[in-house]
Amino acid sequence: SYAGSTTSTANYNTGLGYIALNANTGGYNTAAGALAGYRNASGQYNTSLGFSALEGVASNNHSYNTAIGGRSNELVTTGGYNITLGYQSGDNITSGDGNIIIGSVNADSATDDAQLKITSYDGTTTVNWIAGDSSGNIIHAGTTHSAGGQLTTTGKALVMGF
């Protein structure tokens, strides 16, 4: 399978699938699936499950990512602490950190940090259930909430508190 076939100095890695973790010199990585973690040169503590999950582009160094799903977080180069779940979830993230993407959808930005996106997809239509950004703004099914500031809503809303 060539999994980890050119890895020479890495410790505690597990690669399963065609050229999974092929050139990695970092440690504590787990990759299952063809091309999973393939171009991760020295990153560590990554978990990738699915075809091309956390594959990366060129030689790169990404650490502390969890990608589950085919092509999940596929283009990462230096981004870390990302969680992506679903087919092609967050596959556009290159250097963003601390993003959580659930569902078959891209992050709003390939380089921003602390993005949140929870979606559903039926093969033709994507519905964003919850989205958030590093400023604390949260969008919940068409309603915008701002943490630590003024609450703004669209549509019918009941607001209680001071």
Segments from the language model and where they lie:
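Glycine- and small/polar-enriched repetitive beta-structure motifs of secreted/surface proteins
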Residues: 1-162
